[in-house]
Amino acid sequence: MPAAEAARVGGDWYDAFLQRDGAAVVVIGDVVGHDTAAAAAMGQLRSLLRGIAHYSGAGPAEVLHGLDQAIADMHTDTLATAVVARLERADGNGWRRLRWANAGHPPPMVLAPDGQVSVLGGDLGDLMLGVDPTTERAEPVITVVPGEIVLLYSDGLIERRDSTLDEGMARLAMHLKELAGLPLEELCDALLQQMLLGTPQDDVALVAVRLCTERDRYHS
């Protein structure tokens, strides 16, 4: 799961790990703020989320609910957005079920080998973390097939002072389509170059997951 990140002191993070049943979990998040306090809170939330997901084996919505409750129980004033995605094996042909939950974060995208781009959810999802621990969170499910790429990213990738987030997502989808077929590391690096156009205006994190094809397994 190659990933690229433009590193600054701030609150963006990503993570990837296996739950005990073998499902792969991919996370991206963004703590409000751009200082050492945000960086410290980011590390705390990252560890909490991983622990909750591993111990409980729960799906994305329940994991975010648990994290929200932990924030409330610790009486912190941390606010954050996050997407938790879980990839589960659907059959013996490499197809996977993708479940995800979104707490106020830019929506994930899926890139097909032919360049078609799907935006998962199309908006910023449910309420961000740290506001209301009783928030009920949606957990949509789709099927992803070998060769498709699941992309999670922080808002720093699509933000510009002279455009809206919707326009930024449209630019991202356009560049994804143009870069279809590249290896993951090259795709992430090219996206950063084309989207940021130099120095980023915000913290940026990006993670991409590509489902292996039969050819990938044969040559591995």
Regions found by a protein language model. Name each.
Residues 56-60, 178-187:
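Short, charged, surface-exposed loops that flank catalytic or proteolytic processing sites
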Residues 155:
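Conserved catalytic-loop aspartate of Hanks-type protein kinases
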Residues 159:
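Short acidic/polar inter-strand loop motif in beta-rich domains
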Residues 179-182, 194, 198:
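Hydrophobic alpha-helical segments
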Residues 171, 186-190:
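Exposed alpha-helical structural elements
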Residues 49-53, 173-179:
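Short regulatory/linker helices and ligand/cofactor-binding micro-motifs at input modules
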Residues 1-150, 163, 190, 198-220:
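… and, occasionally, acidic/histidine-rich disordered N-termini of signaling adaptors
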Residues 145, 168, 172-177:
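Divalent-cation-assisted or electrostatically stabilized phosphate/pyrophosphate-binding catalytic cores
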